[in-house]
Curated annotation (Swiss-Prot):
N6-acetyllysine: residues carrying this PTM: 16
Protein's name according to its UniProt entry: Hemoglobin subunit alpha
Gene Ontology CC annotations of this record: blood microparticle; haptoglobin-hemoglobin complex; hemoglobin complex
Binding residues annotated for heme b, in chain numbering: 87
Family: Belongs to the globin family.
UniProt keyword list: Acetylation, Heme, Iron, Metal-binding, Oxygen transport, Phosphoprotein, Transport
High-level lineage: Eukaryota, Metazoa, Chordata, Craniata, Vertebrata
């Protein structure tokens, strides 16, 4: 559960991401594909090369979903219900992949926002991404 301080940290950090969100989303996906090659399975129809327009497009989708989540921190299950259905029932993404992408997102944010990525912000973002992952995997049962 996100504390009031966590919510403040997440909102402030995401505000600093600003209009770089889509680029950071794409970079996190690239990091995930390089670091965890098994994740490429779900994107076999994509060009997974550096600066791929398909990866950039999906990075934007990831960023848009996270932006929506940041705006609905108190109602994540409702806000992300459609995405949860999509990933559980249609795409059937292995839940572990959300943790892998979350890790790559944290690395990307730390690389681009080093002065703002304090231990408390890191912890808050980690809790936030874990909460998003929990919601996205909630309909797998």
């Amino acid at each position: 559960v996100l504390s009031p301080a966590d919510k403040t940290n997440v909102k402030a950090a995401w505000a600093k991401v600003g209009n770089h969100a889509a680029d950071f989303g794409a970079e996190a996906l690239e990091r995930m594909f390089m670091s965890f090659p098994s994740t490429k399975t779900y994107f076999s129809h994509f060009d997974l090369g550096h600066n791929s327009t398909q990866v950039k497009g999906h990075g934007k989708k990831v960023a848009d979903a996270l932006t929506k989540a940041v705006g609905h921190l108190d109602t994540l299950p409702d806000a992300l219900s459609d995405l949860s259905d999509l990933h559980a029932h249609k795409l059937r993404v292995d839940p572990v992949n959300f943790k892998l992408l979350s890790h790559c997102l944290l690395v990307t944010l730390a690389a681009h926002l080093p002065g703002d990525f304090t231990p408390s912000v890191h912890a808050s973002l980690d809790k936030f991404l874990a909460s998003v992952s929990t919601v996205l995997t909630s309909k797998y049962r």
